[in-house]
């Protein structure tokens, strides 16, 4: 029943928020282990660009779904251990050339938040698509891990890239772009846009 599901989700959300608030006030720190953006001052252009950022997030989500199905169908045809060897070789060779796509993306996102100006906007957008492709390849071919942090990293990278293409390196614009693209991407992949 849909109404009971909504009620249960509401209770879970309230309980999670309450427990988080209680533990944060008791022990301090909150989400200190996870990189967070600084507060931004939004301008009129940011509101106009929301549509562009949403389209960027949807493009990544569409690419995620395509590569998820494609890598899954290819992985079914590759014998057991060879699929993991192929995934490891692909990841190793590509990350030798582009180290930003290695690992889950949790630590790399924090680093990217401080070094994004060293990249061309097109490179950041390319890294986002490559991260999505490699994540699906590794998961479908049997390597351990999940898609949550790699998808967040890809969204941040794509948001930075799009914002830099349009607004330059301005910190406020790129932070807003990264947040909107990432929220759109996660909402589309999880199929729960209001949960993000």
Language-model features: where?
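Alpha-helical transmembrane segments and immediately membrane-proximal extracytoplasmic
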Residues: 1-196
